[in-house]
């Protein structure tokens, strides 16, 4: 049996997270609610074979960060903190929690605006949105009284982990970037080997006013089957834990709530998903004493050159690039044993 803390319900639409007419219409069209998301998360975590504590950590403006804590009583080791990617939540680390927490504290939380954390209104300015995310991470750290941490982020979480490390370098013992989003600049269309087809450009222009996952909410009661059809690979990735649609149900309920973090992400991007403020333009300013490890899937369709670029920008600092064979973008789920082992090796270089 898992040792759980008394759970305080988090209203994912609190702190002014409304989105006008669409939000008011969603409950009657989309078969979801905060209770549905809670149940979906509990199904994701019920197969995690180790004890943990869960808590809504309070930060400013009445917001709360939904958090899981593993081996938090081990005070002799630097804690590992996991930041999920866009469209995800802490439940997607289900294949990693037990192994990673064998000898050190591990914390995972839903980013502000995602999962079961509060879903406030974000600024429309990309720099300010980034700062809001970074400050929420810092307030979370202060609330839990963590002195230093090994900060690991996947996808959007990698971008935010790097942004946090730039602003609060004294709090980061090692930065681990897993298939990070938002590092390279968007290439000029003229420089691309394969120009973007006209129909894709037209579709991108048509969808510009909408959030990236608006289609799921527009699909209403058909949204879950849409996730199952578009991403059947997620069911395969977690087949060692679940035989049913637990994972796709979790992803669905994470992404049809109030689109707070989703809107924030949209405000940080330019067409086709590139970052407005690419991290490679700034990562050279990271404190030279912070070691950086970049983990990518050898089969990923995402640009895998960021590690090499970071090395060239930090020639006198520790930067290591690690390829996980047989893994795509979701490295931690594609090859969890290999991923866990590599992360533990990195952590052991800290203490």
From Swiss-Prot:
Q: What GO terms in the biological process aspect are recorded for it?
A: cell differentiation; fatty acid metabolic process; lipid metabolic process; negative regulation of triglyceride storage; phosphatidic acid biosynthetic process; positive regulation of lipid catabolic process; positive regulation of triglyceride catabolic process
The record lists the catalysed reaction(s) as:
a 1-acyl-sn-glycero-3-phosphate + an acyl-CoA = a 1,2-diacyl-sn-glycero-3-phosphate + CoA; 1-(9Z-octadecenoyl)-sn-glycero-3-phosphate + (9Z)-octadecenoyl-CoA = 1,2-di-(9Z-octadecenoyl)-sn-glycero-3-phosphate + CoA; 1-(9Z-octadecenoyl)-sn-glycero-3-phosphate + hexadecanoyl-CoA = 1-(9Z)-octadecenoyl-2-hexadecanoyl-sn-glycero-3-phosphate + CoA; 1-(9Z-octadecenoyl)-sn-glycero-3-phosphate + octadecanoyl-CoA = 1-(9Z-octadecenoyl)-2-octadecanoyl-sn-glycero-3-phosphate + CoA
Annotated localization: Cytoplasm; Lipid droplet; Cytoplasm, Cytosol
Describe activity control.
Acyltransferase activity is inhibited by detergents such as Triton X-100 and 3-[(3-cholamidopropyl)dimethylammonio]-1-propanesulfonate (CHAPS). Acyltransferase activity is inhibited by the presence of magnesium and calcium.
The protein's Enzyme Commission number: 2.3.1.51
How does its activity hinge on pH? Optimum pH is 7-8.5.
GO CC terms in record: cytosol; lipid droplet; nucleoplasm
Q: How does activity depend on temperature?
A: Preincubation of the enzyme for 10 minutes at temperatures above 35 degrees Celsius decreases acyltransferase activity subsequently measured at 30 degrees Celsius. Acyltransferase activity is reduced by approximately 60% following 10 minutes preincubation at47 degrees Celsius.
Entry superkingdom: Eukaryota
Q: In which tissues is it expressed?
A: Highly expressed in the adipose tissue and testes. Weakly expressed in the liver, muscle, kidney, and heart. Expressed by upper epidermal layers and dermal fibroblasts in skin, hepatocytes and hypothalamus in brain (at protein level).
The UniProt record lists the AB hydrolase-1 domain at: 79-184
Q: Name one GO molecular function term.
A: 1-acylglycerol-3-phosphate O-acyltransferase activity
- Name the UniProt key words of this record, in alphabetical order: Acyltransferase, Cytoplasm, Differentiation, Fatty acid metabolism, Lipid biosynthesis, Lipid droplet, Lipid metabolism, Phospholipid biosynthesis, Phospholipid metabolism, Phosphoprotein, Transferase
Q: Where is this motif: HXXXXD motif?
A: 329-334
Q: Which residues carry this modification: Phosphoserine?
A: 124
Quaternary context: Interacts with ADRP. Interacts with PLIN. Interacts with and PNPLA2. Interacts with PLIN5; promotes interaction with PNPLA2.
- Which PANTHER family does the annotation name? 1-ACYLGLYCEROL-3-PHOSPHATE O-ACYLTRANSFERASE ABHD5, RE40534P-RELATED
Q: What is known of its domains?
A: The HXXXXD motif is essential for acyltransferase activity and may constitute the binding site for the phosphate moiety of the glycerol-3-phosphate.
Relate the protein's function as given in its record. Coenzyme A-dependent lysophosphatidic acid acyltransferase that catalyzes the transfer of an acyl group on a lysophosphatidic acid. Functions preferentially with 1-oleoyl-lysophosphatidic acid followed by 1-palmitoyl-lysophosphatidic acid, 1-stearoyl-lysophosphatidic acid and 1-arachidonoyl-lysophosphatidic acid as lipid acceptor. Functions preferentially with arachidonoyl-CoA followed by oleoyl-CoA as acyl group donors. Functions in phosphatidic acid biosynthesis. May regulate the cellular storage of triacylglycerol through activation of the phospholipase PNPLA2.
Protein family per UniProt = Belongs to the peptidase S33 family. ABHD4/ABHD5 subfamily.
**UniProt-recorded name of the protein:** 1-acylglycerol-3-phosphate O-acyltransferase ABHD5
Organism field: Mus musculus
Q: Which gene encodes it?
A: Abhd5
